[in-house]
């Protein structure tokens, strides 16, 4: 039976950390991060003389970004499609290798200490993958085994999180292939929260969710920060979400940071420049700093390039 949906929050335990974490240690340090890709020009392959090599154009997705995120902060990346925000998340999560600069998670380098970093983080992405024939609960239990969570604790916590995210008891055993994309995204968020990571990487976590489901996810993110000292590093297309959740926001454009401040600080700055003192919105901020709409499509395509520093 799934009567555990009504468990009190204090009964839910968390994974033991791999190493003690100093309170004064920044959760995330990004120093001059660089990532380049080969640009796909969409042209047919041409014949070249033997021994000659066709030059491949490079594009910079992350252009020497520097960010420090203190422990316990919710830090947001706001940018149009192709601005580099998802690439930066993948660099932090060790899914991509930086071509330059340094990235450290609680002092651990993402290249030299990859396994330690992965024990401290969890990532939720809009393109999350699942075993579609399995239920929500079975997918979360599988993820828990990868993190060596005790079965009883994992089941208890999975049921608790799914309940808090608004999943009804009778749907816990339903195959994911029968669920909407929005419901599957909720399960992706639950999977990311399952191990109570000390650094939670959220790549557009509420994309595809209805307004009530968005609020459920946002409330749980705030609860994770409050109760488990979780640091959150997120990308979003949702201006209201960035304003509501984030302690600080970096606006990025073409792989570069064009502004970094609190939501109120950014709105004051743009409001003073535009004559909208006290009435500027995050949309005003974004348009003023980038000249783009968040719906503009500038996605970078191609193969990753690993070059020597």
Residue positions per predicted region:
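Conserved ABC ATPase "signature" region
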Residues: 33, 44-51, 122, 141, ...
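ABC ATPase "signature
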Residues: 260-261
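Helical segment within the ABC ATPase nucleotide-binding domain
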Residues: 215-228
């Amino acid at each position: 039976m799934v009567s555990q949906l009504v468990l009190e929050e204090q009964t839910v335990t968390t994974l033991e950390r791999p190493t003690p974490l100093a309170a004064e240690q920044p959760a995330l340090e990004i120093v001059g991060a660089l990532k380049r890709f080969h640009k796909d020009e969409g042209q047919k392959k041409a014949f070249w003389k033997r021994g000659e090599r066709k030059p491949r154009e490079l594009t910079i997705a992350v252009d020497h970004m520097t960010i420090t995120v203190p422990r316990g902060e919710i830090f947001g990346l706001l940018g149009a499609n192709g601005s580099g925000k998802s690439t930066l998340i993948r660099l932090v999560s060790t899914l991509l290798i930086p071509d330059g600069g340094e990235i450290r998670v609680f002092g651990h380098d993402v290249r030299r200490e990859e396994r330690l970093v992965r024990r401290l983080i969890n990532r939720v992405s809009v393109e999350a993958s699942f075993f579609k024939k399995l239920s929500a609960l079975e997918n979360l239990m599988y993820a828990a085994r990868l993190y060596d969570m005790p079965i009883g604790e994992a089941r208890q916590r999975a049921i608790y999180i799914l309940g808090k995210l608004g999943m009804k008891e009778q749907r816990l055993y339903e195959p994911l292939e029968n669920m909407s994309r929005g419901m599957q995204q909720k399960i992706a968020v639950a999977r990311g929260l399952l191990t109570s990571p000390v650094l939670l990487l959220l790549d557009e976590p509420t994309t595809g969710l209805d307004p009530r489901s968005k609020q459920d996810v946002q409330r749980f993110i705030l609860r994770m920060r409050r109760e488990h000292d979780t640091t959150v590093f997120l990308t979003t297309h949702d201006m209201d979400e960035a304003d509501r959740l984030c302690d600080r926001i970096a606006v990025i454009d073409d792989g570069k940071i064009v502004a970094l401040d609190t939501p109120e600080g950014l709105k004051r700055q743009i409001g003073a420049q535009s004559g909208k003192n006290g009435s500027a919105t995050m949309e005003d901020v974004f348009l003023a700093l980038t000249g783009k709409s968040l719906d503009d499509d500038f996605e970078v395509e191609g193969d990753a390039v690993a070059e020597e520093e």
